[in-house]
């Protein structure tokens, strides 16, 4: 467990992790502060951040199980202590870590008698099992248990539907919520005329990411939501005959790049995240793992720097160069001087 003393600056807004601990493989805890804030600001930020943490963070989970020998979800297999339904519920609890999108396949194929745990799952290369000791089933006789698993990355909670059953496969309620809980509290200080606040934010995660990583992703999602308002004055608002109705045109990535070229405002580079640049998911994930989140981050690297990124190919660099050349008429240097 890590603890740090809380020292609040009276000048510059700062955030800090004041406590961090790992209670188990599937329970991480982090406590953060943000200060100094004006009266009312802490509650505004705390409420928005808590909702973003609980509802906007993406997670990876098992969403479907397939076995040709199982006629229905409530079937009991001779030689297995648990019913099929209980096995599905155990698989629902498996915590996975992955940064890739789309559907991935995994499998389990073991022979009893033995205990079957998450360690027996054969995952795709892009997926990591957080706690390999999680129980799945108990085989009491020398029988084979072979099942196929479907893994997806999503956000929130998605319930299985009755019409979603396919030949021998059974859907599982998808719980893509890495943040188990989030709370915020406020501490006021200062005299009556200059009241200021400290925001305390507590985050519990399931181990697939750290509280600090969750805080970063929630913050980025909130920034993405507010970016259109930063450019509102640059857009035409079309009013209908009804004075109470208006339509704001959608902001595209290309529109934002055009505005940057026109206005030459370097600060705008911080407001365009690489997930808005129409890059392929694989390229985007490689950049994200290297802490390249905005165009400003990207332009701070050379071609040589990008080639050092794990799993990055020359084709990925060429694709990035094409985007920068097309929309910015600039190029990344081959190496840093």
UniProtKB/Swiss-Prot annotation:
Pfam families per the record?
A: RNA_pol_A_bac, RNA_pol_A_CTD, RNA_pol_L
NCBIfam families documented for this protein: rpoA
Q: Which reaction does it catalyse?
A: RNA(n) + a ribonucleoside 5'-triphosphate = RNA(n+1) + diphosphate
Region feature (Alpha C-terminal domain (alpha-CTD))? 266-337
Q: What's the EC number here?
A: 2.7.7.6
Q: What name has this protein been given in UniProt?
A: DNA-directed RNA polymerase subunit alpha
Top-rank taxon of the source lineage equals Eukaryota
The record's GO CC annotations read: chloroplast; DNA-directed RNA polymerase complex; mitochondrion
Question: By its UniProt entry, which SUPFAM superfamilies does this protein fall under?
Answer: C-terminal domain of RNA polymerase alpha subunit (SSF47789), Insert subdomain of RNA polymerase alpha subunit (SSF56553), RBP11-like subunits of RNA polymerase (SSF55257)
- Protein's GO biological process: DNA-templated transcription
Q: Which SMART domains match?
A: RPOLD
**Keyword terms:** Chloroplast, DNA-directed RNA polymerase, Nucleotidyltransferase, Plastid, Transcription, Transferase
Q: What class of enzyme is it?
A: transferase
Q: Which InterPro entries match?
A: DNA-dir_RNA_pol_insert (IPR011262), DNA-dir_RNA_pol_RpoA/D/Rpb3 (IPR011263), DNA-dir_RpoA (IPR011773), RBP11-like (IPR036603), RNAP_asu_C (IPR011260), RNApol_insert_sf (IPR036643)
Does the record carry Endoplasmic reticulum as a key word?
no
Q: One GO molecular function term?
A: DNA-directed RNA polymerase activity
Q: What is known of its domains?
A: The N-terminal domain is essential for RNAP assembly and basal transcription, whereas the C-terminal domain is involved in interaction with transcriptional regulators and with upstream promoter elements.
UniProt-annotated stretches for the region Alpha N-terminal domain (alpha-NTD): 1-233
Give the multimer and partner information. Answer: In plastids the minimal PEP RNA polymerase catalytic core is composed of four subunits: alpha, beta, beta', and beta''. When a (nuclear-encoded) sigma factor is associated with the core the holoenzyme is formed, which can initiate transcription.
* Entry similarity comment: Belongs to the RNA polymerase alpha chain family.
Q: Where in the cell is it found?
A: Plastid, Chloroplast
